[in-house]
Amino acid sequence: MADDAGATEAQGDQCTPAQSLGRLLKLPLPPPRIRTRPWWFPVQELRDPLVFYLEAWLADSIFGPDRAIIPEIEWMSQVLLTVDIVNSGDLVEITIFGRPRVQNRVKSVLLSLANWHRKHRARAEKMNQLEEFLKTHASGPQTPEHRIV
């Protein structure tokens, strides 16, 4: 999903609402949201969730494309996480249930991971630009600037 959006942005195309709707209709349905509360999670901590938003490609990088990392994060931090796609797949809503201090700690960890992935992606884009620049300029004549007589 994030790859499709990235490819569209890279081409510079503007998706029309009809194309966007067509893409959404082709996507598989999300898994059902029926979920039982783990035995280790107290009911009273479901009252006040912490909610924040990230770009979808960051959520794919942090949690994996199929969100396989979420149960491990929940078990290790003793929180419950939900990651829901909003805004036509451009953003995800991350909801953290748990004790307030733990919620803030998990949010801080996730935002730190998001920042690292942003920097890593920017660095990779700069390296690709540098490689392209070097390829285009390396094809010219290779004559030394200063001749030794």
Swiss-Prot record:
Protein family membership: Belongs to the KHDC1 family.
Protein name: Oocyte-expressed protein homolog
Keyword RNA-binding appears in the UniProt entry: no
GO biological process: one example: embryonic pattern specification
Alphabetized InterPro entries for the sequence: KH_dom_type_1_sf, KHDC1, MOEP19_KH-like
UniProt domain comment: Contains an atypical KH domain with amino acid changes at critical sites, suggesting that it may not bind RNA.
Top-level taxon of origin: Eukaryota
Species name: Felis catus
Short name of any one Pfam family annotated for the protein: MOEP19
Functional description taken from the UniProt entry: Component of the subcortical maternal complex (SCMC), a multiprotein complex that plays a key role in early embryonic development. The SCMC complex is a structural constituent of cytoplasmic lattices, which consist in fibrous structures found in the cytoplasm of oocytes and preimplantation embryos. They are required to store maternal proteins critical for embryonic development, such as proteins that control epigenetic reprogramming of the preimplantation embryo, and prevent their degradation or activation.
Subcellular location: Cytoplasm; Nucleus
Subunit record text: Component of the subcortical maternal complex (SCMC), at least composed of NLRP5, KHDC3, OOEP, and TLE6. Within the complex, interacts with NLRP5, KHDC3 and TLE6. As part of the SCMC interacts with the SCMC-associated protein NLRP4F. The SCMC may facilitate translocation of its components between the nuclear and cytoplasmic compartments. Forms a scaffold complex with KHDC3/FILIA, and interacts with BLM and TRIM25 at DNA replication forks.
Cellular component, GO annotation: cell cortex; cytoplasm; cytoplasmic lattice; nucleus; protein-containing complex
Keyword tags: Cytoplasm, Nucleus
GO molecular function: RNA binding; structural constituent of cytoplasmic lattice
Domain KH per the UniProt entry, residue ranges: 49-110
